[in-house]
Amino acid sequence: ADVGVAMGIKGTEVTKEAADMVLTDDNFATIVQAVKNGRNVYTNIKKAIHYLLSCNIGEILTIFCATVFHFHQMPLVPVQLLWLNLVTDSLPALALGVEPVEEGVMDQPPRNAHESLFTGGFAFRLAWQGVMVGLLTLAAYFLGEYVLSDPGEAHAAANTMAFATLTLCQLFHAFDVRSERSSLFHIGVFSNPAMNKAFLIGLTMQLAVLCVPPLQVVFSTVPMSPLEWAVVLALAITPVVVCELAKAVSRGRTRRPARAEKVEPACARR
């Protein structure tokens, strides 16, 4: 057997020492709940890694493009990158670690113990989502630099728009990562209290950095116009829309083969 099980009440000390699992209540039904919790722990770790890596890919892509294509100035300054990694990355990642158990987690087949974390399209998903976040940040920078701002304040406004877009993208993106396949509206937008708190704390702190004059000096930000705010919010919410559409397409592809398998036996009987 892969796992040795011993009874915690009636079992001997020898069997408890030799066993991999000890049932403290002598109830085999406890194993089901233990497996469920174990799968949830693994899934939540995977979600946190997904979130952190995809966000970091977005940050790296932004700086990489600015370096390779010789931008006049960097879209983000060092203190802003530190802020992103210490505040807006960490709080949602911690909240993903306590995500409630997803519906249907026990319907999945057992996972191979030697399976890589990056199988099943996981690496591709976090890569394209990270690229999307990076491109949206660059779009905000170019709009602020060349379209929306006055020439004298172009770079400061572009830097602020890029910083705000990247931060809000990451905060909104945390909600996308809560489920690999289920819609955010199906699992409940506010069903994880820890995520709600992380989002509100991160949003409040980011608004302070963008709007409070002493913090604006520290983080090299400037006040944004209503139009610039509207553009930032539209870009920041884009990952939610795109990821929800991708999930819907993935669910549709899964349902079609399942329906075909159900219809095939009926056709065979005829």
Question: Where on the chain are the PLM-derived regions?
Answer:
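C-terminal transmembrane module of polytopic membrane proteins
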Residues: 97, 164-270
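Acidic, divalent-metal-coordinating active-site segment for phosphoryl/phosphodiester hydrolysis
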Residues: 1
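Membrane-embedded transport module
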Residues: 8-182
